[in-house]
C-alpha cells in the first residue's frame, strides 16, 4: 500500500503542469465537456424517445445540474467560467487578464465539441435509427437539435438576437451578484449550486424561442461537431444562417449585463465592515508586558 501511494504521488508530480494558464485551460475544457455531455444527453434522450423519456423540464433540470457539476469539477483551478460570455465579462471588469479570453474560449469550445462527440457515440445507434439511417438537421426527424440550438419557426432574426441578448445579460447580472463579496455573498461551496439554479430559471422562462444557448462555446462546439459528423454545412445555413446569433448576441449581452449590474448595484455597494471575530483573534494574540 505504501509503495502504491508513493508511485501515485510520483506519477502526479511527473504529470503536473507548471504553466498555470494551461492548467486552467484544461479545467475549462473538462468543465464545459461535462456541461455539454449531461445537457445534450438529456436532449438526446427526449428527442430520440419522442418525448417518452423526458420533456422540457427534464432538459432544463439537466442543464442546470450540468452547470453545477462543471463548476464543481473546474472551479478550484480555473474559476469554471464554462462560457466565453462569462470570461468576457470578467475580463471587461478587469477581474481576469485579457489573455484568458482567447485561451478560455478555445478550451471551452473544445470541451463542448468533445462533449457532443461523447453523446453522439453514446446514442449512435439510436440517432441512425431515428430517421431511417439519415442525419437530418431539422423537421420531425431532425437530430441536429440534440447538439446545438436552432430557432423555432415563429422566431425571426431580430427577435432571436434579442432573445439571446436578454438571456445572457440576465445570466451575467446574476453571476456577478453571486460572486460579489460586497453584495450578499453565497455561502462558500454553494456558488456552483446557485449558478446552476440561475441556468435552470433562465431555461424554464426563456427557453421556448431557441433553446437558450446563452453560451457561444456550448452552441458552436457541438454545431461544428455535427457539421463534421455527417449533418454537413446545413447546420450553419438552417434558420436563415442562425449559427452566428448564439455567438455574437451573448457577447453583447455580456457587456450589457456588466453595465446593468455595475450601474445599478455594484458601484453603490460599500465594503463590509471588518469582522469583530477577526479583531478579537488578533487582539488575543497581542502579548502584554507584565
Curated annotation (Swiss-Prot):
The record marks 63, 212, 218 as: Selectivity filter. Residues 1-24, 75-78, 93-100, 178-189, 265-290 are cytoplasmic. PROSITE patterns: MIP. Highly expressed in stomach and spleen, with lower expression in kidney and lung. Belongs to the MIP/aquaporin (TC 1.A.8) family. Aquaglyceroporins form homotetrameric transmembrane channels, with each monomer independently mediating glycerol and water transport across the plasma membrane along their osmotic gradient. Could also be permeable to urea. Also participates in cell permeability to H2O2 and H2O2-mediated signaling. In skin, transports glycerol to the epidermis and stratum corneum, where it maintains hydration, elasticity, and supports lipid biosynthesis for barrier repair. In kidney, contributes to the reabsorption of water, helping the body maintain proper fluid balance. This is Aquaporin-3. It comes from Sus scrofa.
